[in-house]
């Protein structure tokens, strides 16, 4: 069930990015709706705009993937430090008797 929810979140995130990209490029590249088809200039602008946004997205995702292990490690260290009981070492489970 959790896997399906994660897939739905991923799909939702993808669609939000796609819709935002489409809206941004359309507003930038299509100044009027006087013709049914895109003219060559509009088509070139849309191609360039979408390409730039996709390239930017890939670079951001690569940076995220590169930084994620360090972020997870830092969060785990913060969590362990916050949950440690004073006077009890972090390696020792809290519910075990001390001094054994």
From Swiss-Prot:
It is a peripheral membrane protein. A motif (Twin CX3C motif) lies at residues 25-49. It is found in: Mitochondrion inner membrane. Pfam families: zf-Tim10_DDP. Disulfide bonds join 25-49, 29-45. One of its GO terms (molecular function) is metal ion binding. GO terms for biological process: protein transport. Gene3D superfamilies: Mitochondrial import inner membrane translocase subunit tim13 like domains. GO terms for cellular component: mitochondrial inner membrane; mitochondrial intermembrane space; mitochondrial intermembrane space protein transporter complex; TIM22 mitochondrial import inner membrane insertion complex. Keywords: Disulfide bond, Membrane, Metal-binding, Mitochondrion, Mitochondrion inner membrane, Protein transport, Translocation, Transport, Zinc. Coiled coil: none annotated. The twin CX3C motif contains 4 conserved Cys residues that form 2 disulfide bonds in the mitochondrial intermembrane space. However, during the transit of TIMM10B from cytoplasm into mitochondrion, the Cys residues probably coordinate zinc, thereby preventing folding and allowing its transfer across mitochondrial outer membrane. Component of the TIM22 complex, a complex that mediates the import and insertion of multi-pass transmembrane proteins into the mitochondrial inner membrane. The TIM22 complex forms a twin-pore translocase that uses the membrane potential as the external driving force. In the TIM22 complex, it may act as a docking point for the soluble 70 kDa complex that guides the target proteins in transit through the aqueous mitochondrial intermembrane space. Component of the TIM22 complex, which core is composed of TIMM22, associated with TIMM10 (TIMM10A and/or TIMM10B), TIMM9, AGK and TIMM29. Belongs to the small Tim family. PANTHER family: MITOCHONDRIAL IMPORT INNER MEMBRANE TRANSLOCASE SUBUNIT TIM9B. This is Mitochondrial import inner membrane translocase subunit Tim10 B.
């Amino acid at each position: 069930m959790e896997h399906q929810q994660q897939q739905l979140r991923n799909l939702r995130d993808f669609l939000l990015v796609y819709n935002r990209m489409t809206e941004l490029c359309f507003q930038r590249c299509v100044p009027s709706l006087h013709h049914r088809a895109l003219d060559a200039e509009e088509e070139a602008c849309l191609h360039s705009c979408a390409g730039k946004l996709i390239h930017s997205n890939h670079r951001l995702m690569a940076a995220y993937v590169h930084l994620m292990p360090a972020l997870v490690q830092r969060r785990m260290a913060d969590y362990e430090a916050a949950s440690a009981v004073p006077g009890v070492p972090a390696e020792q489970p809290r519910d075990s008797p001390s001094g054994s």
